[in-house]
Every structure is written in structure tokens, then in C-alpha cells.
């Protein structure tokens, strides 16, 4: 388990480090603390390749990239939750979480609460599964791009108008 944690901490360091603001954010020192704590600079951490970086490279468009980033941020929030009682790294994790919160959720506490609610939902609960399936059609409709939805409604209205006039 510790090896996995070390590897994940290294990935966090790399992800945040290569995000374009390496060394400029308040999290730089805290990432170094986590790297030391998890021994994430050890060469064996690189075994198997990167965890997230290759995936991030595959997603070019900003809106698409946000989808992947949300999953990655969710992962790190869960990782930090697993170590919440570890006083040695608590300050570092809090600072990094706050920086992620500012960057990813634009500092919106409402968005943060919603995000936390989503990552806490247990998928093995039957009642949750039933609710999720019940809401699936609405969720799928919400996934449709808004412009396509308007185009489809417009073309349906045109088609109906032609049918009525013949």
C-alpha cells in the first residue's frame, strides 16, 4: 500500500509541477515536503510510467481536459482524505488542497461542496444505484452540447412545419 501512496504522491507533484506555474505557487514547498515524506524521488516510483501525465497529453481541448482534470482532482482529494490524520503532512495537504480549490473550482465554496458530495457517493449502495439509474436520462440529456440541442429543436420545428403545410 505504501508503494502505491508514494507513487501517487509523486504523480501529484508532477501534475502540479508541470501545470505551468511550477515554483510560483504557494504549494511548491509543500509538494517538496510530500515528496520527502512519501520518498517520491526514489527512482522506483517511475516504474510503469506516469499515472496521469500521459492521459492529460491526450486531451487537447480545454473543455475536454476539464473532464479528465476533474477525475484527477477527485483522486487527489480522496488521497488526501486517506492521510487526513497524519499531522506530519497535514499542513502541506491543506495548502495544496486550497490551491487546487482556487485553480480548479475558481474559489467557489458551493462548487467545492458539490464536488465533495459527488466524490463521497458510494456506488455499492442499492438505494444510490436506483436513484442514479432513475436520473440517468436527465443526466444524459444534460451532457448534450447546448448548441446541438437548439439545432435539433429548430430542425424538428422546421420538419413539423413542412409536414403541416403539405
From Swiss-Prot:
Q: Which GO terms describe its molecular function?
A: cytokine activity; type II interferon receptor binding
Q: Does the keyword Zinc-finger apply?
A: no
Domain of life of the native organism: Eukaryota
Major localization listed first in the record, in broad terms: secreted
Segment forming the signal sequence: 1-23
Report what the protein is called.
Answer: Interferon gamma
Q: In which tissues is it expressed?
A: Released primarily from activated T lymphocytes.
Family assignment from sequence similarity: Belongs to the type II (or gamma) interferon family.
Tell me what gene encodes this.
IFNG
Name its species.
Moschus berezovskii
Compartment(s): Secreted
Amino acid at each position: 500500500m505504501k508503494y502505491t501512496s508514494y507513487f501517487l504522491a509523486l504523480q501529484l507533484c508532477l501534475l502540479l509541477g508541470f501545470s505551468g506555474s511550477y515554483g510560483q505557487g504557494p504549494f511548491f514547498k509543500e509538494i517538496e515536503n510530500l515528496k520527502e515524506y512519501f520518498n517520491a524521488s526514489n527512482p522506483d516510483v517511475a516504474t510503469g510510467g506516469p499515472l496521469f501525465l500521459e492521459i492529460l497529453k491526450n486531451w487537447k481541448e480545454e473543455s475536454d481536459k476539464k473532464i479528465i482534470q476533474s477525475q484527477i482532482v477527485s483522486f487527489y482529494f480522496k488521497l488526501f482524505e486517506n492521510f487526513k490524520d497524519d499531522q506530519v503532512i497535514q499542513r502541506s495537504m491543506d495548502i495544496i488542497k486550497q490551491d487546487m480549490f482556487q485553480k480548479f473550482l475558481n474559489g467557489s465554496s458551493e462548487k467545492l461542496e458539490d464536488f465533495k458530495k459527488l466524490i463521497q457517493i458510494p456506488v455499492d449502495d442499492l438505494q444510490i444505484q436506483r436513484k442514479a439509474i432513475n436520473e440517468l436520462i436527465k443526466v444524459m440529456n444534460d451532457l448534450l452540447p447546448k448548441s446541438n440541442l437548439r439545432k435539433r429543436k429548430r430542425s424538428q420545428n422546421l420538419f413539423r412545419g413542412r409536414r403541416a403545410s403539405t
